[in-house]
Design a protein with these regions (language model features):
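Binding/recognition "hotspot" determinant
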Residues: 1-535
Length: 535
């Protein structure tokens, strides 16, 4: 038993910080000669280094356990992820009570960089020598933060909470009864999240030559490659909480908000207040990643040149919902001035929806998923003659994946017998009450509206390659050229292959809407209307 003006139950925090760095410098020299008198020598100097820092905060929650009863009495009770467990009754009396979640956090930052320099030479006959030098550099940096919610809980045979202002992100479980009385109450989701960012590059340059000392000649070669990448993203995921018991009663004099909160009753689930709002949990994802790579090479042993490039972009921007449930044998949601349900499901035998003098609104939460993945690549090769480059081979690819989905987390209330009463208007937008028997009175208008669930997903893949030297025939040679193309399967001397794949998924379905009953005796005193989904 605790009796005080202020009661604070906080967590024990464990903070860790680690730091590491490394620097390595390597020199490699090798030489070889084989039985055919081929000789090669190579030397490379490479340096690389990096650092990584990791910091974390973990919470160990306060645990209060009793074989029989737990009693906490104070003006203000602050519970940070507190874990209560009682064999009989857990009783809380206060003017305000906060049951909040905390978060375990991990933050990582890393950086790495390196550079290399190498030279090589080889010959097979000591008449011609291939010599080369290469230099390279790379840099990568990344940062990430991860947060995982830690919820509090109350577990007992009976849970009684009497307070003025009540805020909860905790799980409340009773084998018998949960009874919460408050002036106002806010139940809300906890959230786990992740952010990440980073980028880097890698560059390599190589120059070489085939040298013939006796002829006083050298044919140069160049090899260049460059790549870069970057990413930036964040996401959050709802961690819902649950109020569970044989009987669950939550009553407020003011507004009762349940967001990201489930109510599970074996027998009776009763939710009441001046105004009652029950809504789904919220999730979001926002990511951007891009990469680019290119390369150029000019060969030495033959007069040739090549080029390649690749680009990739990935983006996502999604807003979705985690639906919540209010279940019991008998479910009653009652307010003096309005009931709003969004993204809620319910299964019961008896359902009572009473908005008092206010409006009754059953709506669906809109989920949007937007993803775009694009990958493009090109590769060309050809010969150089008379200061002119003529492509003789090449390939390319294009891959595009696009997702544009808009669906809904519906409000769906399934029961055997339902009573629906509202002193104002009633609307069922992408939402429905499904029952055998429905009765009640709607003093204002009643409007039902179907919403469209749209799924649009397209995947396109194109790959092409070709080889040969473009040869436009003269007027007197066209017949011979056409014959050669026919025999070789080419066009103007160029062979080409292409493969195209397209996969598309386009679906549109309607949500349920309105009151669907075998016997519907609801009296609508205003205008009753319905909007069907249009294809």
């Amino acid at each position: 038993q605790e009796n005080a003006k202020e009661v604070l139950h906080t967590t024990a925090k464990n903070s860790t910080n680690s730091f590491g760095n490394n620097v390595n410098v390597d020199l490699t020299v090798s030489a070889s000669i084989d039985k055919s008198k081929a000789f090669s020598v190579e030397a490379e100097l490479a340096a690389k280094g990096g650092r990584e820092t990791v910091s974390s905060i973990t919470h160990t929650a306060t645990q209060l356990q009793a074989g029989k009863n737990i009693s906490v009495n104070a003006n203000h009770i602050q519970d940070n992820a507190t874990q209560y467990s009682a064999g009989e009754t857990a009783q809380f009396n206060s003017s305000s009570h906060q049951l909040v979640a905390v978060a375990n956090r991990v933050e990582k930052n890393s950086l790495s960089a390196g550079a290399s320099l190498g030279v090589s030479a080889d010959t097979t006959d000591f008449q011609r020598f291939n010599v080369a030098a290469k230099v390279g550099a790379n840099y990568n940096q990344s940062a990430s933060q991860e947060s995982n919610a830690v919820q509090g809980s109350i577990n007992a045979k009976n849970v009684n909470i009497h307070t003025g202002k009540f805020n909860s992100q905790a799980n409340i479980n009773a084998s018998e009864n949960v009874n919460i009385q408050a002036q106002s109450a806010q139940f809300s989701q906890a959230t786990s999240s992740k952010t990440q960012s980073g980028g880097g590059f890698e560059a390599k340059v190589g120059v070489g030559a085939m040298v013939v000392p006796s002829a006083g000649a050298a044919v140069p070669s160049i090899d260049l490659s460059l790549s870069a990448n970057g990413k930036n993203g964040n996401q959050s995921q709802a961690v819902t909480n649950t109020i569970a018991g044989k009987n669950v009663n939550v009553q407020t004099q003011g507004v009762l908000n349940l967001q990201g909160t489930n109510v599970q009753a074996v027998e009776n689930a009763q939710l009441s207040g001046k105004r009652v709002n029950i809504t789904a949990g919220n999730n979001h994802v926002q990511n951007v990643a891009a990469s680019v790579a290119t390369g150029v090479n000019i060969g030495a042993k033959v007069a040739n040149a090549g080029f390649n490039a690749n680009v990739g972009v990935n983006t996502e921007n999604s807003q979705t919902h985690t639906g919540v449930a209010v279940n019991g044998k008998n479910v009653s949601i009652q307010a003096q001035n309005g009931v709003n349900l969004k993204g809620v499901t319910s299964t019961s035998e008896q359902l009572n929806l009473n908005a008092g003098k206010g409006n009754l609104a059953l709506t669906a939460a809109t989920d949007s998923v937007n993803k775009t993945d694009v990958s493009v690549g090109l590769k060309l090769g050809g010969g150089v003659a008379e200061q002119k480059w003529t492509p003789s081979s090449g390939s390319g690819h294009l891959a595009v994946n696009v997702v544009r989905n808009e669906t809904h987390t519906e409000t769906t209330l399934n029961t055997d017998t339902a009573k629906i009463n509202a002193g104002g208007d009633a609307k069922f937008i992408g939402s429905s009450v499904n029952a055998n028997h429905v009765s009640g009175t709607i003093s204002g208008d009643s409007h039902s509206e179907q919403l469209a669930n749209k799924v649009n997903e397209v995947s396109v893949s194109l790959a092409a390659n070709g080889s040969g030297k473009l040869a436009v025939p003269t007027t007197d040679k066209w017949a011979e050229a056409a014959k050669n193309d026919w025999n070789n399967g080419s066009i103007a001397g160029v062979k080409a292959d292409a493969k195209l794949e397209v996969n598309a998924k386009h679906q549109q379905t309607a949500t349920n809407a309105g009151v669907n009953a075998t016997q519907d005796t609801v009296v609508v005193k205003g205008v009753k209307s319905r909007t069907e989904m249009k294809n």
